[in-house]
């Protein structure tokens, strides 16, 4: 595997929020199927780089208001140079996240550092794959499923 120090900000944000969620709600440690934080890109760029709606998804399970859950998650976030300030809680419990400028530039720096090896990996090596071409709707997002 090439020495690529590619920093995936989306995964890093997910890990940060997963840690905060489990810190705020230790009861989730006991679940057979642990809850996994999903980080999405908001449709409106004014809402930040990423958004998390886990508070809405967990409200019924935790028996709490989504906004209270969101506040607990944000309050439990560990210090990180990944985020630009405190994430914003919007609406009923959405958490909007802005990345620090340094976090964005680290991705570009890792691409240049990898040089010609950027994008190479060993996942799936030696196996055949089938690639299908789609007729995508240019006005909507592309998805699988």
Predicted regions and their residues:
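Charged, compositionally biased N-terminal leader segments and the immediate start
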Residues: 1-42
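Short, charge-patterned binding micro-sites
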Residues: 35-53, 90-95
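Short, small/acidic-rich helices and loops at N termini and domain boundaries
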Residues: 46, 50-68
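N-terminal catalytic cores of NTP/NDP-binding nucleotidyl/phosphoryl-transfer enzymes
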Residues: 57, 61-62, 106-145
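Short, flexible active-site-proximal loops enriched in glycine and acidic residues
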Residues: 68, 80-90, 118-124
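Short, well-structured alpha-helical segments that form the helix of a local strand-helix-strand
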Residues: 70-78
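Structured, non-catalytic alpha/beta "coupling" segments that mediate domain-domain communication
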Residues: 78-113
């Amino acid at each position: 595997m090439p020495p690529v120090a590619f920093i995936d900000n989306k995964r890093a944000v997910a890990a940060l929020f997963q840690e905060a969620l489990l810190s705020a709600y230790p009861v989730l440690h006991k679940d057979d199927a642990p809850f996994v934080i999903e980080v999405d890109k908001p449709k409106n760029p004014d809402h930040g780089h990423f958004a998390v709606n886990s508070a809405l998804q967990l409200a019924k399970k935790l028996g709490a208001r989504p906004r209270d859950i969101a506040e607990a998650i944000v309050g439990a976030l560990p210090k990180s140079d990944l985020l630009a300030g405190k994430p914003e809680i919007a609406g009923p419990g959405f958490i909007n996240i802005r990345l620090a400028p340094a976090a964005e530039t680290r991705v570009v720096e890792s691409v240049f550092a990898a040089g010609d090896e950027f994008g190479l990996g060993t996942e799936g090596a030696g196996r055949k794959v089938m690639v299908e071409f789609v007729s995508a709707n240019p006005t909507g997002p592309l998805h699988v499923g």
